Each structure stands twice: as structure tokens, then as C-alpha cells.
């Protein structure tokens, strides 16, 4: 009996060891390569985030439970220009600066700028629950995002969905109005709204075709 118990314990140990190795390998395969390039993050930024969340959402939070991914373009031609736009804490008037969680360069390189659950200002009405991905391009409103960016976005969104099962929705910034059907939109400031065209229907169609079987909800691509 003692011998049997010893054998059983050894079998359980080996299973746990092998499962740990397998899980680590799977995680490594599913996590896309990315470069951490943090923007400045201080107590002052946290305070500005808190003020923004209280004013616009009635929430006293600086972090989110991710429920959506909002896809953008930068309207610029380098990742550095977008990075330095997001880098500082305020917009010069003392209000919270815009920022996104990720930037994807033209060649598909992914830069992570903040914690994935930080509350960043990138999409009116959804910042309290959405992760933002900025794609370099869209200068003068041209739909010019690359295949490499599409593939990187697919990998990144799939990784985020696996890491945060609370994520159900993926939409482009220009789809912000129809995305209100999700029930996620909150805005307490009257008239606070903007019209967007990024990242365009072609890119969003590509994302939908690659990810619609992953249990994510998309919206019609047309403007």
C-alpha cells in the first residue's frame, strides 16, 4: 500500500510538472512579442485619471476591468510621434492627456505603453472599460494600415481576450455610436462627443474575419 501511494504521489508530481511546462509553452506561443515603452506615470497622472473618471463616469477608479478593445489609427507616420503625444500627463490645460495602451507600428511591432488595465483616455464613453490599440497610419484620413499591422492586431486582441475573458467587444473608433448597443457607453458630460473615422472599415473587416470565431462581438464595418 505504501508503495502504491508513493507511486501515485510520483505520478501526480510528474503530471503537475509536465502540465506546468505545457502551460508555460502555450502561454509563450500565445503571447505576441511586444516592447514595453512606458509613458510617464506618476501620482499626478493617477490623480488626473481619478478626476476624469469621476467627472465622466461617476467612478472613483484608475484601473479597469476590460470589456472591450477599441482600435484606432494615429493619423501620423511614426510610432514615436504617437508615443510622445501620449507621454506627458496633461494636455497643457491641466486636464488628463490622451493615451492608449498599445501602439502598433507599420511593420507590426507592438509597443506597450501602460498597464493593460490602466484607465487611459482614448475613446469617449468607453475609457472606463476599454483597452486601446493605436495603429501608426491614417494620415489625412487615408486607409493605409498594413497587413503586418492587421496580423499584429489579431495576435494582440487574441492574447488580450485569452488573458481577460471579460472582453466581449471589438470595434473601431469610428464605430463608437453603434457600439452603444453593447450597453458599455457611459458619459456624464452633455455634448461631449467627437466624430471619428479610424481605423476604417477595411481594417475592421480584416479583424472580424480573423477573430469572429473567437467568441468576440463585432459591428457592421460600414460608416
Q: What do these predicted regions represent?
A:
Residues 117-119, 132-144:
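Substrate-binding clefts and substrate-entry loops adjacent to catalytic sites
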Residues 11-20:
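Bacterial N-terminal signal peptides
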Residues 29-45, 139-223:
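Basic/polar, cationic surfaces and motifs that engage anionic cell-wall
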Residues 124-129:
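Flexible, solvent-exposed short loops/turns enriched in glycine
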Residues 2-11:
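Bacterial N-terminal signal peptides that target proteins for export
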Residues 24-123:
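N-terminal catalytic cores of peptidoglycan-degrading enzymes
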